Amino acid sequence: CRQCNKKISINYFFVELIIGIFFITIFLYTSNYFDFILINLILILFLIIFFIDLKHFIIPDILNFSLIFLGLLKNFIPTKNLNFNYDIEQSIIGGVVGYLTIWIIIFLYKKLKNLDAMGLGDAKLMAAIGTFFGLKSIPLILFFSSITALLIVLPSLINKTRNLKAEIPFGPYILISAVFYYFYGDKIYQILLI
């Protein structure tokens, strides 16, 4: 940095590169400006949450509440991106169930082990995801985020570079799973229902 003479983290370069790639991809993928703006806002918030939770083990409320607001707002704007749910009732139910699912996990783990399994930031993030995709997305996104976390963390547990009591930010895995669900959720449900 020219101002403070400190080294700028390489993470900033990657974040800006990822945003640029997303921006171009979304521009080519979307058919109208409402979709373009909405999806870009969502992905920018996802990236900010991803890196903040990864580094600081916290998801600021302002980011979660911004996502929840966008998840509810999308029901009223003239866009019909088929990968989102467009029923306000389903958005609200999805948000409530997303929040309560994580809250119950936190509550039960606290009762059984007297430890915090996750933070309420993860619960609010699942509420936001529920507002975008509705109730049916919650089990699949939680399943995929748990499997993704396990696959990424398991090698460090086997190598003993991390122990079972180490903090693991769960938000990034929820976000990865939400993006996966955005593209493949309906296809997976079609396979499961066959």
Regions found by a protein language model. Give the residues of each.
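Cytosolic, membrane-interface loops and tails of multi-pass inner-membrane proteins
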Residues: 1-12, 104-118, 155-164
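Alpha-helical membrane-inserting segments
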Residues: 22, 26, 30, 73-74, ...
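Functional transmembrane core segments of multi-pass inner-membrane proteins
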Residues: 41, 48-148, 191-194
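Interfacial loop-to-transmembrane junctions
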Residues: 119-121, 155-180
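Conserved post-catalytic alpha-helical subdomain immediately downstream of the catalytic base
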Residues: 136-166
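Hydrophobic, aromatic-rich alpha-helical transmembrane segments
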Residues: 9, 13, 32-36, 61, ...
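N-terminal transmembrane signal-anchor/hairpin module of polytopic inner-membrane proteins
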Residues: 1-33, 190-194
